[in-house]
UniProtKB/Swiss-Prot annotation:
GO terms for molecular function: DNA binding; DNA-binding transcription factor activity. This is HTH-type transcriptional regulator TdfR. Residues 18-37 bind DNA. Pfam families: HTH_1, LysR_substrate. It is found in: Cytoplasm. Involved in the regulation of 3-chlorocatechol degradation. Transcriptional regulator of tfdB expression. Acts as a repressor in the absence of its effector (either 2-cis-chlorodiene lactone or chloromaleylacetate) but acts as an activator when its effector is present. Residues 1-58 form the HTH lysR-type domain. GO terms for cellular component: cytoplasm; protein-DNA complex.
Length: 295
């Protein structure tokens, strides 16, 4: 059974005449007649009662007509969906993320993408960078979002944008630092860094930044994540450095101030298989790059 046979049958049923159906289909009558006969032979039933005035559906034909219409509609829908999928307009994108990217970057990306490609679906999973790389290779995620990815063969790391650094300190320490929020001033402060796992990391970058400025950091704790670091800061256990997206969120007993002498910025990056041909990933990257150009 072919879609062509279904189209010819539906046209003949709706017109009540094979000749009229042929004119509607912009073909000659004999092919329509042959294909309807072939369809009847395939089904093993008569679909039409034929007369000099035209054709009339048999009970079997009337029952088959509704199914034929549904099959034709399904065929059209399937073609449309397959073409949309090839353009990345539908399909599921699986994303792994880590750390402070969830505060502004990930929500902004997801909002922009769902506005541009409403037919796509998204899934998010919190996972360390090492697991993101493993998941990319295994095909269980299409994209990772985070910072300071290691160089890996077959993996592309694309910097999306850069954020300035802020000092985060408890209320009493912040009052002292506010007049001189510099790396040099932090030389005498206890420093809480994050994260503990996943080298290279934000903690490594902060240490390197301070050493480039001639300051040997007094690291008193390296904790699991930014929330743990800010918890210690709020308790007066030290200070930490955070990206601008974290500084923008108000927290009890924590004050933030932009670094006065640090021009360095930290990247937010996307990572994916270099040779990926997943259309919905390509569509997502196009949206992300357009947004990058607007920053």
């Amino acid at each position: 059974m072919e879609f062509r046979q279904l189209r010819y049958f539906v046209a003949a049923a709706e017109e009540g005449n094979v000749g009229a159906a042929a004119r509607r289909l912009h073909i000659s009558q004999p092919p329509v007649t042959r294909q309807i006969h072939a369809l009847e032979q395939h089904l093993g039933v008569l679909l039409f009662e034929r007369s000099a005035r035209g054709v009339q559906l048999t009970p079997a034909g009337a029952a088959f007509l509704e199914d034929a219409r549904r099959m034709l509609e399904l065929g059209r829908t399937s073609v449309d969906r397959s073409r949309a999928a090839s353009r990345g307009e539908i399909g599921q994108l699986d994303i792994g993320y880590l750390g402070t990217a969830i505060y502004q970057t990930v929500p902004a990306l997801l909002h922009a993408f769902t506005q541009a490609v409403p037919g796509a679906t998204l899934s998010l999973a919190l996972m360390p960078k090492v697991r993101q790389i493993e998941a990319l290779r295994a095909g269980t995620i299409h994209l990772g979002v985070g910072r300071f990815y290691p160089q890996e063969p077959g993996i592309t790391v694309e910097h999306l944008h850069y954020e300035r650094l802020y000092i985060a300190a408890g209320s009493s320490i912040a009052r002292q630092l506010r007049q001189d929020p510099t790396l040099l001033r932090l030389k005498s402060e206890s420093l809480v860094l994050f994260p503990k796992e996943g080298r290279p990391s934000f903690a490594d970058e902060v240490i390197a930044l301070m050493r480039r400025a001639g300051v040997e950091p007094r690291v008193t704790a390296i904790v699991e994540d930014v929330n743990a670091a800010l918890g210690l800061v709020a308790a007066g256990a030290g200070v930490t450095l955070v990206p601008a997206s974290v500084a923008a969120i108000r927290r009890p007993f924590v004050r933030t101030m932009e670094m006065a002498d640090a021009s360095d910025k930290v990247p937010v990056s996307l990572t994916y298989l270099t040779d990926s041909r997943v259309p919905v990933l390509r569509a997502f990257l196009d949206v992300a790059r357009r947004g990058k150009g607007q920053k």
